Amino acid sequence: MEEVCSICLEVLVDKEAFTEPCLHYYHNECIKEWTKRANTCPKCRRDYSQIRIGEEVISVKNRSLELHLVDETLEETRERLISYTNLCALCEDPSTSLIYCESCGGSFHFNCIGIGDELDSEWCCPLCGMFQNHLGEASNRNLISATPVGEGRRRVTSIVNTRRTNSIYRSHSNRPAQRAHLMTDSDYTMIVDQHREKLLESQLQESNTQSSGEEESWKLLDEALKSGTQNSQSSEFSTENNVVPLKNTHELGRKLKKPRRASGIKKNVVERSSSHQSTQILKPSSSLISDLLLETRGNSRHPSFTNSTQKLTVEALQSHDPTLKLNIPKTETLSLDQKIVIQKLFIKPRLRNLYDSNTLSKDNYIEINKIICRRLYDKFLQDQLALAYLKQVLEVKERLHGHDLKQFLAQFTHWSELNDFTDDKWQKQETEGSCNHKQTQILSMFDSIIDTMLQNELHKLLT
């Protein structure tokens, strides 16, 4: 087996350089660089005094540091290794039958360190590596405290605890919040009086800020609430055939609102009544009045007396009564399949030709496609014959190719090719997709519209 250099882990070809006295071989450059930093052998960690490279002998300076340790420091380091609980340091199982180390104070089971029950056998501590004889068992912490290690532990522990207590006291006594126990009763009384004066001053300032105008506004609001409550109670006893005109409804809503100028109220009532009185007669409901009263009471603590108040209009009544909502027609939109037919048969062939001829870039292609598609969708929605044509194309697709619309449309490059379309499955001419004369005229007109749109967009790009 080839020997390798322990420094660079490469194969040793020429064994020329070695250390003395351990006689371990290395590369010349490797051992020289190693010697600049340490004089211990990389393999066995023994100190060497010189190295031999062939016939050359190089002396090595001792680079080990001399350590001057204090006994108290050693005892404190030793203290950290002492087991403070009756636990085995290897299996961490509590037991009263333990053996302890004289050097580090670690506790172990007899079976864990492999000495059995022989009292005169030697054993090695797994923690500190100290060889020692079996001296006895450590059943509790009192046995450890009887040794020199226990005495040193007590001395170091007392010093550390004293220093820790003093530092904690100093850190807490320097904080203002921790000096509260040093204050007298007179100090507490002075602090309470200062806070009471500040609270009284703030309350006086808030009470002075309330003006006389606000007091009058509050009074008017209370009167409006009282009148609204009376009207709501009287409406509960009214019959179902009682019909209230729109003008009276506005007057009832005006009583529930905040005070405003009379001129603005009259003008608003005339405009609202003239626009809606001739069209419909509204019937007030008790739920509407109760909702408005609850809404007014909820905002009564912080009212804002402005002219932009919510009025009792037809729209407000419709939001409470679903039977009064107007039937607003929904705007018709194209389906996804119809949009695909328009793109594949009308727009894509033209844009594809421009893109293949390098007239349009990729970004321009996408942008123009969006613009033309949106405009053409609106054109198709406005013409019923064009919509009928789209439905006919989708019916042919469903009969012949099921749900694969793109595969069906990939066979054509223009909408006119559907007129001559034949299928082997049907073995006959399909007339559902063919256009009549009016549809052909409309779709041809769409072709001219698309060409005009393309010319305009290309002109914008060039300019």
Curated annotation (Swiss-Prot):
SUPFAM superfamilies, per database record: FYVE/PHD zinc finger (SSF57903), RING/U-box (SSF57850)
SUBUNIT field: Interacts with ATG28.
Stretches with biased composition (Polar residues): 229-242
Induction summary: Expression is induced by methanol and glucose.
InterPro entries: PHRF1/Atg35 (IPR047157), Rubredoxin_Fe_BS (IPR018527), Zinc_finger_PHD-type_CS (IPR019786), Znf_FYVE_PHD (IPR011011), Znf_PHD (IPR001965), Znf_PHD-finger (IPR019787), Znf_RING (IPR001841), Znf_RING/FYVE/PHD (IPR013083)
Biased composition (Basic residues): 255-264
Lineage: Eukaryota, Fungi, Dikarya, Ascomycota, Saccharomycotina
UniProt-recorded name of the protein: Autophagy-related protein 36
Keyword Membrane: no
Segments forming RING-type zinc fingers: 5-45
Sequence segments annotated as region (Disordered): 229-281
GO BP: autophagy
Highest taxon of source: Eukaryota
Keyword line: Autophagy, Metal-binding, Zinc, Zinc-finger
One Gene Ontology term of the molecular function aspect: zinc ion binding
Chain intervals annotated as zinc finger (PHD-type): 85-131
Function text: Micropexophagy-specific protein required for efficient micropexophagic apparatus (MIPA) formation but not for general autophagy.
Organism name: Komagataella phaffii (strain GS115 / ATCC 20864) (Yeast)
